[in-house]
Amino acid sequence: MASLAQQFSGLRCSPLSSSSRLSRRASKNFPQNKSASVSPTIVAAVAMSSGQTKERLELKKMFEDAYERCRTSPMEGVAFTVDDFAAAIEQYDFNSEIGTRVKGTVFKTDANGALVDISAKSSAYLSVEQACIHRIKHVEEAGIVPGMVEEFVIIGENESDDSLLLSLRNIQYELAWERCRQLQAEDVIVKAKVIGANKGGLVALVEGLRGFVPFSQISSKAAAEELLEKEIPLKFVEVDEEQTKLVLSNRKAVADSQAQLGIGSVVLGVVQSLKPYGAFIDIGGINGLLHVSQISHDRVSDIATVLQPGDTLKVMILSHDRDRGRVSLSTKKLEPTPGDMIRNPKLVFEKAEEMAQTFRQRIAQAEAMARADMLRFQPESGLTLSSDGILGPLGSELPDDGVDLTVDDIPSAVDI
C-alpha cells in the first residue's frame, strides 16, 4: 500500500499557461461584457477542477477501504500474529502437574517470596514458607537471590492469574529423610539440638526434621528444661517417612561413645562448668571431670586462671567407670614440660597425640610387666620374664617342674 505522502504527491495542479495569465491581466484592466461568451481559458479551468475532484474521490475511497480492513482484519498481512503465538504456546509440551520438578531461574525477590521463570506461559511463585525447610523471614536467608538457578517442585496453581506455585521445602524434606535413612544404615552418632519437650520425651532437630527422643532413651538425669537449646548425641532407632516417624536414642549414642573411650585416648572437649575441685568437660555428649590436680604438673590455685566455660581443649582419658558413668580426664599427662598447661596451653594441644602415645606405651609396658610377674608363678604357660625384664619362653632360670610353693610360703592378706 502506497504511503500517504506518495498518495498526495500526485495531487498537483497543472501550471497555468502564459496566455492564461495574460488573459487574467487583460480581464482586470479591460472589463468585458458580461453577456459575452465564455473564453477557452475558463473552460480549461473548469475541466481541471473536475479532474482534481475525481482524484479526491479516489483517495477518499482508498482511505475508507483501509479503515474497513483495519476494523475487520487488523492482522492481515502480518507474518506472526497473536493467535500464532498462542498456538505455539499450546504446542509447547510443558508439564504443569502437581509434583512435577522443573528447573527455574529466580528473577525477583521480596519479603514474601520470589518470582521464578520456568519457561511457562507466566512466571511461577515461590513463597517464603516454601523456600526452606527451616523457618525464615526472607527468602534471601535461604540463599535465594535473583539469578539463582535451582530445581523446584510444582505444588499448586494460583487461581487468580493461573500462575504456578513452587516449593523448595518439599524437595529438602525428601533429601532430609533420605539422609536420615543413610545415617541409620551407617549406625553413626549425630548431634542434635533439643528444641522442645512433651510428656513423653524431648523433641530434637535432626537434618531439619523434628525427631522424638523418649525419656527412657535419655542417659542424662537432667530435667528436660535443662536440656533445652542444648546439643546431645543421638542414634537413630526408627526412620519412617511414610508415617513421618523419627525416633532417636541418646542412651545408645552415649553407650557407643563410652565404648570408644579407651584409656590414654585424646578427645576434643568443651568446658561446661567450673567447680573448686575441677572442671566438667563435655566430650561428645558425655561429661568428664578434669580434676584440679590433673590440669598441670604445677599447682593450680584458681582454675579460672587456666580455663573458662566454653573453652575448647584436648584432654586425655585417664579412667572410665562404665558402670557409674564417670570419666576422669587429664591435661597434665599431655604436658611436654611440667607447667606448659599454665604457660603455653597451645603447645600442649599441639603435642597432645604425641604425649598420649608415650603415655600409652608406658601403660602397655607396665601391663606387660604385671602379666610377666604373674607368669613367674605359672610355669605351665611356657613363658617367663628374664633378668632384663623381657618376656620370653621358659628357660633355665626356673626348674622344669616349676617352683614348689607351699601354703606357708604365701603371705596372708593381713601380712600384706
Swiss-Prot record:
SMART domains: S1. Keywords: Acetylation, Chloroplast, Plastid, Repeat, Ribonucleoprotein, Ribosomal protein, RNA-binding, Transit peptide. PROSITE patterns: S1. It is found in: Plastid, Chloroplast. It comes from the Eukaryota. Residues 1-34 are annotated as: Disordered. Induction: By heat stress (at protein level). Disruption phenotype: Reduced plant size and pale green leaves. Residues 9-21 have a biased composition (Low complexity). Gene3D superfamilies: Nucleic acid-binding proteins. The modification N-acetylalanine is found at residue 45. InterPro entries: NA-bd_OB-fold (IPR012340), Ribos_protein_bS1-like (IPR050437), S1_domain (IPR003029). GO terms for molecular function: mRNA binding. Residues 1-44 form a transit peptide. One of its GO terms (cellular component) is plastid. Required for optimal plastid performance in terms of photosynthesis and growth. Required for the translation of plastid mRNAs. Involved in cellular heat stress response and required for heat tolerance. Required for transcriptional activation of HSFA2 and its target genes in response to heat stress. Plays a critical role in biosynthesis of thylakoid membrane proteins encoded by chloroplast genes. This is Small ribosomal subunit protein bS1c. It comes from Arabidopsis thaliana.
